[in-house]
């Protein structure tokens, strides 16, 4: 077990409000570093009713009070795609987020792990979390993709091979010339679904040329 420092902490409109309350119960009034905290209106934007509108307002008010970045209605989007596009995710960084598909960031050579709202509260306050170092499963893609084969097809084939629990307590590491040839969009699809095999993360090769082509990368 190791203590891992967070380069980015993110929560959405489901995990965020719960984390805010848990953080308050901890006795923490401020986040560890506002420049490393992001809130995204992902699940309930645009608001479908008054209750969800109030929830989004609560998130915005909290973010404004903490001085953290908030991607709200009209500025938000699919949280994991958004953070990649906005340049929050860089190779080698560690991202803790209150969503199971945080493994998506492995597409850009980052370690992203999804945590529960109580753990996210601790990350917001302390900027760190405990992590058991996962073992690695090497997934080698050889040859070239055939026409109409997508990144999602590849990861579904992997999950079909190892099963929905085959990656438990592991990281999937995608290697080989087939992995290196994947586009950024394909990498995102492959890494995003690593959790569907129980994996903590799905790491793709960090190739400078393809990483530089990612929208918003800086």
What are these regions (language model features)?
Residues 1-218:
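Fe-S-dependent hydro-lyases/dehydratases of central metabolism
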């Amino acid at each position: 077990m190791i203590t891992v420092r967070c380069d980015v902490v993110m929560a959405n409109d489901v995990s965020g409000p719960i984390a805010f309350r848990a953080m308050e119960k901890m006795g923490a009034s401020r986040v560890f570093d506002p420049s490393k905290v992001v809130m995204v209106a992902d699940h309930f934007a645009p608001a479908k009713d008054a209750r969800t509108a109030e929830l989004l307002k609560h998130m915005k008010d909290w973010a404004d009070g903490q001085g953290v970045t908030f991607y709200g209605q009209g500025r938000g989007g699919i949280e994991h795609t958004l953070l990649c596009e906005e340049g929050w995710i860089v190779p080698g960084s560690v991202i803790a987020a209150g969503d199971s598909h945080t493994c998506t960031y492995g597409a850009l050579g980052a370690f992203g792990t999804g945590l529960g709202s109580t753990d996210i509260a601790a990350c917001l306050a302390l900027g760190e979390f405990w992590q058991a170092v996962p073992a690695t499963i090497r997934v080698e893609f050889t040859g070239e993709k055939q026409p109409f084969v997508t990144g999602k097809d590849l990861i579904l084939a992997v999950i079909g091979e190892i099963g929905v629990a085959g990656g438990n307590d592991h990281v999937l590491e995608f290697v080989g010339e087939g992995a290196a040839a994947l586009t950024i969009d394909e990498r995102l699809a492959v890494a995003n679904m690593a959790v569907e095999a129980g994996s903590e993360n799905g790491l793709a090769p960090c190739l400078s040329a393809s990483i530089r082509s990612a929208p918003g990368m800086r």
